Amino acid sequence: MSEQEALKCSSARNRGGTQRVEGKLRASVEKGDYYEAHQMYRTLFFRYISQAKHTDARELMYNGAQLFFSYNQLNSAADLSMLVLESLEKSEAKVEDEDLEHLAKLFSLMDPNSPERVAFVSRALKWSTGGSGKLGAPKLHQLLAVTLWKEQNYSESRYHFLHSSDGEGCAQMLVEYSAQRGFRSEVDMFVAQAVLQFLCLKNKNSASVVFSTYTQKHPSIEKDPPFVQPLLNFIWFLLLAVDGGKLTVFTVLCEQYQPSLKRDPMYNEYLDRIGQLFFGVPPKQSSSYGGLLGNLLNSLMGSGEDEEGEEAQEHGSPIELD
């Protein structure tokens, strides 16, 4: 027998052994021997880990967690879910979409109000930074956002959409959020905040997609500009200005639409950061003019009218995105 054939036989035996073990554990759960089954899962997990069988350990815990969830054994299920994460951490496994989908599935099965869920998602996002994204893998954020949207936890869903790359999904959630929880007079503010925050995260593409999708799908908004709401016209012009990178255009926009921008005190904070990122505005400093406009006017007088976005400051004080 060749070495390759021997490896195949060994792998088949391992799968067969794992399946037999899972069958026995499932039978214990079905009989109601939850505590005994839970302890057996834990024993097998640490045995597999000590043998560096990380994939086997992870698959066993993932299937076991789902089984316990199906029998409403939430504490045991949450514990095995944490062991799934532990196996990923100890194996230093590469971040794969399948693993992210499994983590999101376990998250969706947990009690939304449980402290275990909070601990699980925090740890999962931290592990996922091994792939892409300082605040967690965008794919995981997107999956979490969809689950929270289904639970009508719109504010938490919006946070995770912001750290994903799914502008379209974010817009559709915001349309529902606006319809379910907002006033008719605030339909423009839901999308304005999202666009400004996406731009603060240097995600121009998602900012554009969320705006176009939201305005197309919201029943209380015209499908195309110009819009009745001045704030929507400002956001539309801002997205065009970001592509052009002209400081003069940005300054005039902020000046002309000040009445609309005063509706939320955070807008000028976001715009100050956007000015730094895309229009070469230096970080906020004390000014005789005061505020955002003063900073913009100082920038114009100090750098000329043809300041380009490519020379924008990459570093500045971060803005807390809720």
From Swiss-Prot:
Subunit and interaction comment: Component of the bag6/bat3 complex.
Q: Which GO terms describe its biological process?
A: tail-anchored membrane protein insertion into ER membrane
Where does this one sit in the cell? Answer: Cytoplasm, Cytosol
What are the record keywords, sorted? Cytoplasm, Transport
Q: Which domain of life is it from?
A: Eukaryota
Q: What does this protein do?
A: As part of a cytosolic protein quality control complex, the bag6/bat3 complex, maintains misfolded and hydrophobic patches-containing proteins in a soluble state and participates in their proper delivery to the endoplasmic reticulum or alternatively can promote their sorting to the proteasome where they undergo degradation. The bag6/bat3 complex is involved in the post-translational delivery of tail-anchored/type II transmembrane proteins to the endoplasmic reticulum membrane.
Q: According to the UniProt record, where is the region Disordered?
A: 303-322
Q: What is this protein called?
A: Golgi to ER traffic protein 4 homolog
This protein's encoding gene: get4
Q: Which Pfam families match?
A: GET4
GO CC annotation, single: BAT3 complex
Major site of localization recorded for this protein:
cytoplasm
Query: Does the keyword Lipid metabolism feature in the UniProt annotation?
Result: no
Query: Which InterPro entries does its entry note?
Result: GET4, TPR-like_helical_dom_sf
Q: Does the keyword Lipoprotein apply?
A: no
As for family, the record states: Belongs to the GET4 family.
